């Protein structure tokens, strides 16, 4: 499950 913090890293 991708965490919200990982999403920020993608951006």
Swiss-Prot record:
**May I have one GO cellular component term?**
extracellular region
InterPro entries attached here? Tachy_Neuro_lke_CS
What are the alphabetically sorted keywords of the record? Answer: Amidation, Neuropeptide, Neurotransmitter, Secreted
Residue positions of the PTM Methionine amide? 11
What positions belong to coiled-coil segments? none
> Record's superkingdom?
Eukaryota
Taxonomic lineage of the native organism:
Eukaryota, Metazoa, Chordata, Craniata, Vertebrata
Described purpose of this protein according to its UniProt entry: Tachykinins are active peptides which excite neurons, evoke behavioral responses, are potent vasodilators and secretagogues, and contract (directly or indirectly) many smooth muscles.
- This protein is called what? Substance P
Membership in a protein family:
Belongs to the tachykinin family.
Q: What is its main location?
A: secreted
């Amino acid at each position: 499950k991708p965490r919200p913090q990982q999403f920020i890293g993608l951006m």
